[in-house]
């Protein structure tokens, strides 16, 4: 794993240098060409990361991913959730992420180019701006991923969804797709080191907000969390911070 780690660092440095090509494409070929290049970088990076660590991914409900831009609402188990979702969704996506994530060398640079939106929960005004930016991304054709727990769950547990965490999903008026990630925490978070693991990703049926009553919209976060918890319990696991 030490040798793989060295090779991965070299790979990431090479990926950062490709930012030169991104700048060229954006300036001379336009946003569409630049965005396609970012999508290519994201897919190659996620594939390389998953292969290097030795992650086996089982995907269920791939057919539930809409062709149009949507909001993916997922539990958050590990930093590996990002490459796993890039790989399994296989379409242009951005993340609503803690502002600290966009400061990570190399990764932060490309997350920003991939239309990821930094979120500062301690600043209400900036949080509103972030939501507006996420809505704008969806209108421009980019799906967004939300982690309503606001932080990674310990040992894969599903934490409570933060109050107001689905404001983007509500304002965007786009389809909402519940996503369950199970097992990624074993690839890093549990022992704070990378190691091979098996991951299960489940895409639930899209939720059309226009078909929901006001009461159902209010309870949307709770119902999606319940769906995620039940998907995990199907495997005989009880990874929930609170019983339902």
Question: What are these regions, as identified by a protein language model?
Answer:
Residues 2, 128-244:
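Non-catalytic C-terminal accessory region of glycerolipid acyltransferases
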Residues 60, 96-98, 120-121, 148, ...:
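Thr-Gly-centered strand-to-loop micro-motif
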